[in-house]
Design a protein with these regions (language model features):
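Residue-level signal for inorganic ion chemistry
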Residues: 32, 43, 70, 153, ...
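Short active-site oxyanion
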Residues: 36-40, 64, 152, 212-213, ...
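Asp-based phosphoryl-transfer active-site loop
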Residues: 4-18
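Conserved acidic, metal-coordinating active-site core of Asp-based
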Residues: 99, 103-217, 225
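Active-site phosphate-binding/coordination module
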Residues: 23-123
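Non-catalytic pre-domain segments flanking phosphatase-related domains
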Residues: 1-8, 27-30, 34, 171
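Short, structured coil segments at secondary-structure junctions
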Residues: 57, 62, 70, 173-175, ...
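Mg2+-dependent phosphoryl-transfer enzymes with acidic/Ser/Thr/Gly-rich catalytic loops
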Residues: 1-5, 22, 188-273
């Protein structure tokens, strides 16, 4: 049996449009875990925002990994240990603050179990906190307050202007950060050269496995790197067009148990042959 590593984005992939993991998806994941394969949840979410999915899938019992902040932190589920971490240079924070202020954007980072916001939360910052089930703390002086290690910042803007702002940020900070949108209104500011693919490569090497063992499934822009990297890259039926173009296979949507199709086709069926 060739060991497989199933790598799953959360929002729009593992969860349906109601932000739920269906029973069929849970059973499929438990089945492959019991057959000796591995599961990694890979998300732009902060680590606390992944805990509910970790608990629902019983990954502390079965084993698994949380690749959070788009790959800037990796946690082993059984031990809770942080096994890999990358941080942003704090020197970038004042410039991000001024840029966000000038363009009317939201700007947040993460501390402990919550979100730290530079301004009164807009609807996109509120959405980020709600999705992750974590509180928002608005601070008076964001630049002075952020004096701790940060895995990422998130800038929020209406989707009509976000692409242009993303481009400007990339031009300004490409030497120190990786910048890309995970949603039409979320601009991720990450440590340079950190994405889901680079962190996954680090993990697989530690496991003694290669990209050929990986089946990566996603729907958003921040999933493209790992979908292109994987031996088998899968786009959900609800994925952005650019994600589908990058994929080897397009499965059903997240409301059609698309992951069950992937598990059957690429893991369980080959095992029987």
């Amino acid at each position: 049996m060739q060991e497989k590593v199933l790598v799953l984005d959360i929002d729009g992939t593992l969860t349906n449009s109601k932000k739920e993991i269906t029973e069929a998806t849970k059973q499929g994941i438990w089945n492959i875990l019991q057959h000796g394969h591995k599961v990694i949840l890979a998300s732009g979410r902060p680590t606390p925002g992944m805990r509910k999915c970790e608990e629902e899938l019983e990954l502390k019992k079965y084993g698994g990994y949380l690749l959070s902040f788009n790959g800037a932190r990796i946690v082993e589920c059984k031990t809770g240990e942080v096994i890999y971490q990358r941080t942003l240079p704090l020197s970038i924070v004042p410039g991000l603050y001024e840029f966000a202020k000038a363009n009317g954007c939201g700007l947040i980072t993460y501390q402990g179990e919550g979100v730290i916001s530079a301004f009164e939360p807009d609807k996109y910052v509120q959405l980020e906190a709600r999705i992750n089930g974590i509180p928002i703390q608005v601070v008076d002086d964001f630049v002075s307050y952020v004096d701790f290690d940060i895995n990422k910042c998130l800038m929020t803007a209406p989707e009509e202007i976000a692409p242009e702002l993303e481009k400007q940020l990339q031009e300004k900070y490409s030497d120190v950060a990786s910048i890309y949108r995970s949603e039409p209104y979320f601009i991720e500011i990450m440590p340079k050269d950190v994405n889901k693919a680079t962190s996954l490569d680090h993990m697989l090497e530690g496991m003694g496995l290669t990209r050929e063992n990986a089946i990566c499934c996603g729907d958003g822009y921040n999933d493209i790197s790992m979908i292109e990297y994987a031996g088998t890259g899968v786009a959900m039926g609800n994925a952005q067009p650019a994600v589908k173009e990058a994929a080897d296979y397009i499965t059903g949507t997240n409301d059609e148990d698309g992951l069950v199709e992937v598990i059957d086709k690429f893991i369980m069926k080959p095992e029987k042959e």
